[in-house]
């Protein structure tokens, strides 16, 4: 039987990939990678791009193209068999990556290229790729004695395993709780769309009634709209104690020991490499200079936002008391009364807006924005093999009708699909040895409500923002003009700059001129009426300071957890969180809350000692967008400048340089505070 993963393909053959194909394909690809490394090194000096970097980029690309669909399926179509196969490949990949990072001969070959005459003949992107490779050798412990190198490899392998275990615990804990409500009176206040979804969930399980789960499209409407306080509390407890030692499934999928070991190993790894803490190691590949700069940035922002956050909460408490006679707001009351207050102040709710954002309008509106700013057109293809019938596939063409890249769009929440929204690369742009150009392909994944009862999928405005955000990442990947592996698209972009294109794209969701075609009632097609539009814009910064403070809580918690770790004390996870809450949070959290246990961003994603990146990039994005506000939000020349200077440059140059080229100066904090309506 042939292995579809080992048969060359331009797009992954999703319907043919079976769990039993995974390990043999990855093993074979790794064997080829090792052979290519040995053969390139054996070539001997003088080394050049052609005899060293290019051949390795090509085998690496094959490995990536085999592993990418596997890892993607593990996220969007998880099954016990696939999970097992995926887990078997993790140690193999980790071991290979350590082997490469500590390959003395390969390191010498790169140093020879860096110090030899050939370096001068490389273009900017190639030089950056070589410099990054040398930096990564240092960060893989190339200079360490053999014992320490061995320990580095053990730690890296164990961390990869632990991250996966953490992620599985969160997924299992999320899927491990649900509640069937048989009396609709218990769901009073819930919008029609949420009831229909809960009913469909129950029917899918052949049950009568309404099935509630901890997936966001099910959880949020209960917290926001359900009049039943006991049910809100029950769901809040289940959600905020997922994968922990507390709550309805206490101890069942507990991430406490996983986090403790992750933090201990990260610290040991950082120290092995000569860093004071993992925070220093994290910043070795980021835009921010040192931990102090990050802490100052976060603390300064907290100082500016805190007074307004306190005011927002005080107003909410006063409102709940005056209108509903509520003496004490519990954590599971905040979203509920906030929605009521928002209605009261602006007479607008997410649900009122939903009919104006049917999927087809939101998606075609997004494409229209991209066409106006960058001259890029999206065309759908229906002949592509996908992992689920609901997945769509599009190609992007520029004004010269050149294919620039393509992407899969997977919008709805499903069982066995991890929550959240993300962009991932399927194929990276790369110039091949034979001169051909491999075009980029992306995955865009969201978890929105699916169409029910013959209506199209109707999005909330927040979901439209999420769609624009992920598409911003997608454009960064697909519109790259760099064809050097390792620095094209999002590759090699420092983590605190990678959110710039995504947060930047969100701005158009608030522009009346853009909303005119992003919105359209699913029955009549009429765009958002002026009156609703004005209310929506007025409500834009409702509780903005509370939102920023929540992000600061996450950012400071993550950063201080890594920066202040002391081996003799171990991980002070809940203590650190409590301290930071005192400093920045205005909404008190219950002592049994276990937010860290499901904070996948930092324990199973790429955001360790890096969650601050969201706010850091927010500053860049707001400042970049302010140039559009000055020159016109659909100014094609401004759009071209952003495309030429930032989007298309990938990781080929330092982000600060690219930003200054577009903006003419360094970023300033003011635009961001203004965007959030914070008088700092």
Label each residue range with its predicted role:
Residues 217-219, 269, 399-401, 411-414, ...:
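Short, glycine-/Ser/Thr-/acidic-enriched flexible segments
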Residues 1-190, 628:
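N-terminal helix-rich structural modules
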Residues 1-24, 28, 189, 197, ...:
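C-terminal, non-catalytic "cap/extension" segments appended to globular domains
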Residues 78, 122, 133-137, 250-251, ...:
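Aromatic/His-enriched, Gly/Pro-containing loop or helix-boundary segments
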Residues 7-21, 70-89, 112-154, 213-257, ...:
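Short His/Asp/Glu-rich catalytic/ion-coordination signatures at enzyme active sites or charged loops
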Residues 125, 129, 158-161, 168-213, ...:
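Active-site-proximal, well-structured secondary-structure segments within enzyme catalytic domains
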Residues 449-467:
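Short pre-active-site segment immediately N-terminal to the catalytic Zn-binding motif
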Residues 98, 442, 465:
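Acidic/His-rich structured neighborhood in mature extracellular/periplasmic domains
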């Amino acid at each position: 039987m042939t292995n579809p993963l080992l048969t060359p393909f331009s797009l992954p053959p999703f319907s043919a990939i079976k769990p039993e194909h995974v390990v043999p394909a990855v093993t074979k690809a790794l064997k080829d990678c090792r052979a290519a490394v040995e053969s390139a090194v054996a070539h001997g000096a003088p080394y050049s791009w052609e005899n060293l970097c290019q051949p390795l980029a090509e085998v690496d690309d094959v490995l990536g193209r085999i592993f990418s669909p596997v890892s993607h399926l593990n996220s969007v179509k998880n099954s016990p068999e696939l999970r097992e196969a995926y887990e078997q490949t993790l140690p193999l990949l980790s071991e290979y990556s350590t082997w490469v990072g500590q390959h003395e001969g390969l390191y010498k070959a790169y140093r020879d290229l860096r110090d030899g005459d050939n370096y001068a003949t490389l273009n900017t992107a190639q030089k950056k790729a070589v410099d990054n490779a040398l930096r990564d050798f240092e960060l893989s412990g190339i200079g360490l004695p053999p014992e320490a190198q061995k320990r580095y490899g053990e730690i890296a392998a164990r961390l990869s395993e632990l991250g996966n275990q953490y992620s599985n615990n969160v997924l299992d804990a999320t899927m491990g709780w649900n509640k069937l409500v048989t009396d609709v009176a218990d769901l009073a206040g819930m919008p029609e769309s949420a009831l229909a979804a809960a009913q469909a969930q129950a029917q899918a399980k052949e049950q009568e009634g309404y099935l509630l789960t901890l997936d966001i499209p099910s959880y949020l409407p209960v917290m926001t709209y359900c009049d039943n306080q006991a049910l809100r509390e029950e769901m809040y407890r289940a959600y905020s104690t997922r994968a922990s030692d507390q709550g309805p499934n206490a101890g069942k999928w507990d991430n406490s020991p996983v986090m403790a070991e992750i933090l201990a190993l990260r610290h040991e790894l950082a120290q092995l490499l000569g860093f004071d803490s993992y925070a220093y190691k994290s910043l070795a590949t980021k835009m921010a200079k040192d931990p102090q700069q990050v802490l100052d940035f976060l603390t300064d922002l907290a100082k500016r936002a805190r007074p307004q956050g306190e005011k927002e909460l005080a107003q909410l408490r006063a409102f709940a008391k005056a209108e509903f006679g509520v003496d004490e707001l519990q954590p599971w009351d905040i979203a509920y009364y906030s929605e009521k207050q928002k209605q009261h102040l602006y007479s607008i709710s997410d649900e009122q807006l939903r009919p104006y954002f049917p999927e087809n309008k939101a998606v075609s509106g997004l494409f229209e924005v991209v066409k106006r700013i960058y001259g890029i057109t999206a065309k759908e293809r229906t002949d592509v093999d996908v992992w689920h019938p609901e997945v769509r596939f599009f190609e992007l063409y520029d004004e010269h009708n050149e294919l620039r890249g393509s992407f899969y769009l997977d919008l709805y929440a499903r069982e066995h699909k991890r929550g959240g929204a993300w962009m991932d690369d399927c194929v990276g742009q790369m110039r091949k040895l034979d001169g051909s150009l491999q075009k980029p392909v992306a995955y865009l994944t969201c978890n929105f409500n699916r169409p029910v009862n013959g209506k199209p999928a109707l999005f909330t405005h927040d979901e439209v923002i999420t769609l624009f955000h992920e598409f911003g990442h997608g454009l960064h990947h697909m519109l790259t003009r760099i064809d050097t592996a390792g620095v094209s698209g999002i590759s090699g972009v420092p983590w605190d700059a990678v959110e710039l294109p995504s947060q930047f794209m969100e701005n158009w969701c608030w522009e009346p001129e853009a909303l005119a075609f992003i919105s359209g009632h699913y029955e009549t097609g009429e765009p958002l009426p002026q009156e609703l539009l004005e209310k929506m814009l007025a409500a834009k910064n409702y509780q903005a300071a509370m939102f920023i403070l929540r992000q600061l809580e996450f950012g400071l918690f993550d950063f201080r957890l890594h920066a202040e770790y002391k081996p003799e004390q171990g991980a002070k996870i809940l203590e650190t969180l409590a301290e930071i809450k005192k400093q920045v949070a205005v909404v008190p959290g219950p002592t049994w809350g276990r937010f860290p246990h499901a904070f996948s961003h930092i324990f199973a994603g790429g955001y360790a000692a890096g969650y601050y990146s969201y706010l850091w990039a927010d500053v860049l994005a707001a400042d970049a967008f302010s140039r559009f506000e000055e020159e016109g939000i659909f100014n094609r020349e401004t759009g071209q400048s952003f495309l030429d200077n930032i989007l298309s440059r990938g990781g080929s140059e330092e982000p600060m340089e690219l930003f200054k080229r577009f903006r003419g100066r360094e970023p300033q904090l003011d635009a961001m505070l203004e965007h959030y309506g914070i008088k700092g």
